[in-house]
Amino acid sequence: MGENEDEKQAQAGQVFENFVQASTCKGTLQAFNILTRHLDLDPLDHRNFYSKLKSKVTTWKAKALWYKLDKRGSHKEYKRGKSCTNTKCLIVGGGPCGLRTAIELAYLGAKVVVVEKRDSFSRNNVLHLWPFTIHDLRGLGAKKFYGKFCAGSIDHISIRQLQLILFKVALMLGVEIHVNVEFVKVLEPPEDQENQKIGWRAEFLPTDHSLSEFEFDVIIGADGRRNTLEGFRRKEFRGKLAIAITANFINRNSTAEAKVEEISGVAFIFNQKFFQDLKEETGIDLENIVYYKDCTHYFVMTAKKQSLLDKGVIINDYIDTEMLLCAENVNQDNLLSYAREAADFATNYQLPSLDFAMNHYGQPDVAMFDFTCMYASENAALVRERQAHQLLVALVGDSLLEPFWPMGTGCARGFLAAFDTAWMVKSWNQGTPPLELLAERESLYRLLPQTTPENINKNFEQYTLDPGTRYPNLNSHCVRPHQVKHLYITKELEHYPLERLGSVRRSVNLSRKESDIRPSKLLTWCQQQTEGYQHVNVTDLTTSWRSGLALCAIIHRFRPELINFDSLNEDDAVENNQLAFDVAEREFGIPPVTTGKEMASAQEPDKLSMVMYLSKFYELFRGTPLRPVDSWRKNYGENADLSLAKSSISNNYLNLTFPRKRTPRVDGQTGENDMNKRRRKGFTNLDEPSNFSSRSLGSNQECGSSKEGGNQNKVKSMANQLLAKFEESTRNPSLMKQERRVSGIGKPVLCSSSGPPVHSCCPKPEEATPSPSPPLKRQFPSVVVTGHVLRELKQVSAGSECLSRPWRARAKSDLQLGGTENFATLPSTRPRAQALSGVLWRLQQVEEKILQKRAQNLANREFHTKNIKEKAAHLASMFGHGDFPQNKLLSKGLSHTHPPSPPSRLPSPDPAASSSPSTVDSASPARKEKKSPSGFHFHPSHLRTVHPQLTVGKVSSGIGAAAEVLVNLYMNDHRPKAQATSPDLESMRKSFPLNLGGSDTCYFCKKRVYVMERLSAEGHFFHRECFRCSICATTLRLAAYTFDCDEGKFYCKPHFIHCKTNSKQRKRRAELKQQREEEATWQEQEAPRRDTPTESSCAVAAIGTLEGSPPDEPTSPKRPKSISEPQHSDAEGDAASPLPSEWTSVRISPGEEAAGQDVLAVRVLVTSEDSSSDTESDYGGSEGSHTEPCEEKPWRPGSPHLPHTSLGEALSRAVSPQCPEEPRAVHAALQRANSFQSPTPSKYQNWRREFWWSLTPVNKRTMSPPKDPSPSLPLPSSSSHSSSPPSSSSTSVSGNAPDGSSPPQMTASEPLSQVSRGHPSPPTPNFRRRAVAQGAPREIPLYLPHHPKPEWAEYCLVSPGEDGLSDPAEMTSDECQPAEAPLGDIGSNHRDPHPIWGKDRSWTGQELSPLAGEDREKGSTGARKEEEGGPVLVKEKLGLKKLVLTQEQKTMLLDWNDSIPESVHLKAGERISQKSAENGRGGRVLKPVRPLLLPRAAGEPLPTQRGAQEKMGTPAEQAQGERNVPPPKSPLRLIANAIRRSLEPLLSNSEGGKKAWAKQESKTLPAQACTRSFSLRKTNSNKDGDQHSPGRNQSSAFSPPDPALRTHSLPNRPSKVFPALRSPPCSKIEDVPTLLEKVSLQENFPDASKPPKKRISLFSSLRLKDKSFESFLQESRQRKDIRDLFGSPKRKVLPEDSAQALEKLLQPFKSTSLRQAAPPPPPPPPPPPPPPTAGGADSKNFPLRAQVTEASSSASSTSSSSADEEFDPQLSLQLKEKKTLRRRKKLEKAMKQLVKQEELKRLYKAQAIQRQLEEVEERQRASEIQGVRLEKALRGEADSGTQDEAQLLQEWFKLVLEKNKLMRYESELLIMAQELELEDHQSRLEQKLREKMLKEESQKDEKDLNEEQEVFTELMQVIEQRDKLVDSLEEQRIREKAEDQHFESFVFSRGCQLSRT
């Protein structure tokens, strides 16, 4: 018997194994039947079947399966199979979801029957599995049934295999499965229940099937159909036509096939190039494609209909999708060919053969189907009751919620629904009342569509049927029983009315958004808002709005700082309307529906258009309390939350605009202009300054470090706003008109606009400030004078309210900059101001000429079709040069006595300025306002030039601006002179579109555009479907497009390059270049006349260009939405871009380049409100300085300006001699002004710049534009750079001097005021980040690459105290730009041009590279001396010297200690404190140290004065002190330090300490590594710096708060750091630092002294992936030499010992070149372990990092100096390297898996966004169609039937509100898509950088290093862009939260109650 038993057991095991291994449905059933017969089991005994089967099959394989199934069945919810013992369930459909539901019900003990109409599982389609799904299937023994299940990194499975697994489990658990049985319908219980009680049954096919008598209590529909079970209404989600093709190819499992990588998906959102390449090569046009490898090679793709028609796949085109895809209309052969071609291309032709697998019909397994519409059931369950029998009806799977296939949601959400349904059945069996049961089920169903792998619980082990274990924050009662009464279907209930709908809780958002609004309400609201405004009487929605005053009144009502209502002329309807349209679009994202010209020309504006337009204001502002001006100002001054400061009104109404638009109103402007304020509040101007002071950039006292954080955020937002405004206002003729009009009026609109004191007295320019002493105290006499001028200017420009207001704000802030410190200097300023007035007068003359030229150039843009002469003539006729307000302004404001500050930004003294390529204009209103943080609204150019001498405040900046504007205009020859500098400039463009039809004519198809379907961009109106790329015809979105203003064409991002390279553009460029050369000649002749003005103007122009918003580049508010693509936004590229003169006509409408770069640059300029204007001045200075070396010569007010001196310099000099502080303030003001008003480069220049970059991809960023010596050379730096105004001191632009001699530049401090002599080299971009001195080692450019403001970087490098200024003779133009040095040579002040730079740039002086040797040596020595000697040396030196590393210094460099050299400490304790503060900021590597020179030029006290300043506690002062701080470490150095910190534990421990180290490292290293690798992101965001000490301001000489600058400037570090950076990569030692620089991605390198926490926080802010540092650790192992170089952070090596120490460290690695016999130094004590996780690192990933750390530590331990190594280094190295290799492989594998998972997450998000965008588009199209129908009826063009006009209008209004919501939603999706695209790009760049760093340093050549630098720089830029997006989203979130709170309080105040759902 025993043998028989054993045999039976063996046989049973074999039969069971056959069942488990069955590979088909039929085979499985057959094996199961054999098994049950063999074991004598009854399958119908569902309660005992599993337990009997388990007892009879006891093989070890079976036991493993039983263990898993028992573990699942042990959940308490099942109650050991007794929860639902009396329940009978019928499941229709045997798919994965139906079977999974059956398994759960079987565990509950229910009787489960599954009917499946097929008898085969033939679907090879592959499903993506979520992590929880994989875990769940493993728990059911999936591995036992299918050994390959999710092996390795596989996370997908074919439907067939999944069905087999679940099928077998269900059979084992006693589920009754019937195949070849089709469900027909449910049969109700018969009415005759007396004889026998028959319950619910079903009808099947075949009709005689035994199941026909089966009665059940629960029926579940799981067949994927939409109408199998009655009673479920469906919601349709219609997207664009989506045709999916699935193809399965035979998988022969060959080695070649195994090597082919799968494609988890390619999303069009962030990989458009792939699809465009596919289309070009094969003609196949797809939207996405996925490739999975399983039993087959499975491809699924979404094809575009036109592509299918072109390839002959679809024979005829039909509108009806069913007809389109019917078998008769599909060519099967072409379909097979289409699928094969796509598969080949997607796999890069690596699959050896693509033979189609066969389906169950014996045909090639290729299918085409439509999923244009996806459906979801409105409800998940219902209860039917008949004859006292209740039936629970439920849906699961696709029947419940149809999935979007690329997302992989079908299986995951299907399983979740199965669990929820089983939970419901359990409750049903326990007697829960039907309504409660249904309410709970619906509550869960509402969560289902929102579930993602990220928002469900991560602890899969705890998953049970209970929804609380799966859904976090579950509210299972959000749906109330009364809300589901309609789901309880019974005769008795049908007659009962449902409860009032009002009782249903609605979310606050819904309640508010859906409030019932009628046109009458709209009219009443408008009347209320415009009540009390002069000349405004709203009686209707048409004629009352014709003058434009009513629109302006509404905007002024809620945002008084945006419009100067008092300056508006009632008769000028065109400009009033255009102003309102432009401000609304720029600030609120409300697109115009017509133009100002049309509004004024029509007798009665179109009612429908007005209803639609005004409704957007209503939705935006309704319920918004007016914010008291004073409180607003106070909040702003206190750095109150930006979003709150906005007063709950988002900058972009519909989120339509991207970050640039969202920027908070950071300007210091008050809610109202001074006049209004006085009128409403009764405050005198004297009081106003105090209000502004808190906001003013320069107010050190009020803007304490506590405000810094707020300021930084403001800076970002302001930068964004500036960009948007700058671009938008680029072509606003209306502004010019407005200015003209205002000037004509001549009444002093705002007497006090310039300065508070001035306001009261309106003193003459010469007069000192009037008596108001308190305010006077802040104001310099010059300020008063300029104030007067400003007032006059303002009068002229009163029309441009925006301008006037900014002026005021700026003036105030400037005055404050002067602060009390300036009070003493008041008397001295007057003479200077007067002297300035003379300069200004000369400037004016020059400007007039420039303006004339500029008008001609503008004509080119506007009328590109004509030749230049014709264009000029046309412009002259249109705008009349004589009319320019310039003359008026000049005469009025710029008298000799007065330095009338052209600052009055409005009319900018020179009309040209205002007209200046809307550069100024664009910058003007909008920008200015945004800039207004500083309060400046001048044209950027004006401000820059003016501010130095005029007054610290408005005047000085005004003058600088005027000069700069002139230069910009001249150089950029942008638009016609827009007279109004106000934001209207853009409006002007739109008002008078030269080549446009009316707003009701489509720009593309020339057909009529009805109001509801009208879209607008760049002043054009068009249909949605007409808005396509000119090349590929891809439909464009308002948030993502590029525009060539010359040709009037729109492009998609990938094809924008086309407009840069086509021949027409080249020709145009050539013409422009010639023109510019002629202009340059003219300018040279004029230069002597202009003197400084010329120079400053040039600088200004450069700045403008840097700003990057090419004047031509019209920036629609929407364009700001789109973030420039990384490739376009290369700040470096921009920097390298040709001078403005070179910039060619192409303009990227979305501001691809300009946008990204501009935003950065602008951000820098605007950066700190609290920061003194210095910050901005730094920018300006950098521009000037970088262009050429300058010596600063003290300038005496009496002395004439040197011909080459920049106006800014002259001004600063005039001021500086007497009072360093005053000059400082003045300089700051100037800089700020400059920064704000950088003229934008002409589009031509932009084009040229981009083209130039494209020619030299690697070096383009570092290269200067090809020999473009235009005098006004805007810094090549990216537009963003341009934003920074040239500091007065650095303003001198070498390029400015026509002769090529660079105008002298003044250093920031008067004593230093040195003008470096140099030849004007085209200003190379300050960002030389990438540029490396030819002789110098290539280092990772400072963080600057990120920021468009490289200019600062230049300065930064030069810390006057640390790096001596090189002798003027020595300095080349590059040298002049110390900031650049940090970029190129982080350590050196001199910028070494890339080799390319040197070539391309025209150097009047010797090339940097040649200088590198000598100068560097001198410099290094000098630097050292300076380091030790402190500021004194700096004073002595007039020029910057380049530092050359001596061998000793090189070794010093290797001392990676962050600590400052003792000499430095001893030299200046103050410096140390400053430094620490700076480091506290996070010591951004990228931070260029502020141009030390510039700060001084600003009037910053000399280093000697530093001590006194430092004593002052204000951050600004500290910042000044910072200048003196030792030069920042080069990024390389910083990186090396960071790396050292992270790796030192590995390197430094001795053998004995290895174990301890391994433990510690596992904890410490990850955090450190994180810090090292990625603090980049945060620094970019400008947030981290603020968080730290006030020292963060250090980067800027004057304004500590300037966040933007901060980001760019390098932390000031001991100069010793620079030596290595400066030294050429001759030795390995030098290479290491260089390598390190490249390796480290961290922007901020905290000092070693800083606690690790700060580093960690920086890292977290970056949100970079753990993988990056882990991989970095691995890479670091390969570089043993580097590793050894890192010393303990605390250990200091004296310079003399550093070489020896280095050699010792390198010994173990046998670096033959460095190896020495010296014994290795003892290991330093291990640093305290940092917190367990770095801010950004996920705790869950920490273990991996720990492993990495351990591995690396052990690996490094061999290499690290240890006793073992000393005795037998070779042996230990070999052994450990083997271990390391194994671990590395393991880690690499894990890393790849993590990378893939992250990629998948992004992919699914992208695909979901893509689908949602398509759905929104379809809904918009549907609403547009309906809107057109209504519009025709309202206009009498169609029969309206029985509806009267009131009904139609009401319907129209509802439609308008619906469309507004859709637009809002679309804008949010687009922002999400953009962020996702940047995230993906960042991830790829990180991976690329890691791969490059894996290469041994010794094997890298110059090309490798350059590529590494480029990748690093690009990565920085991407991070910067992501930060901006995230900030804008956060702003929006806070704003909406504030709105909700306000709404709730409003509701509660009326005794109502709201509940959220």
Swiss-Prot record:
Chain sites annotated for binding Zn(2+) 1: 1002, 1005, 1023, 1026
Subcellular location: Nucleus; Cytoplasm
Residue ranges occupied by any bMERB domain in the UniProt entry: 1796-1945
This protein's record includes keyword Cell division: no
Enzyme class: oxidoreductase
Protein name per its UniProtKB record: [F-actin]-monooxygenase MICAL2
UniProt free text on domains: The C-terminal RAB-binding domain (RBD) (1796-1945), also described as bivalent Mical/EHBP Rab binding (bMERB) domain, mediates binding to predominantly RAB8A, RAB10, RAB13 and RAB15 (in their GTP-bound forms).
UniProt-listed CDD domains: CH_MICAL2_3-like, LIM_Mical
Region (Monooxygenase domain): 2-494
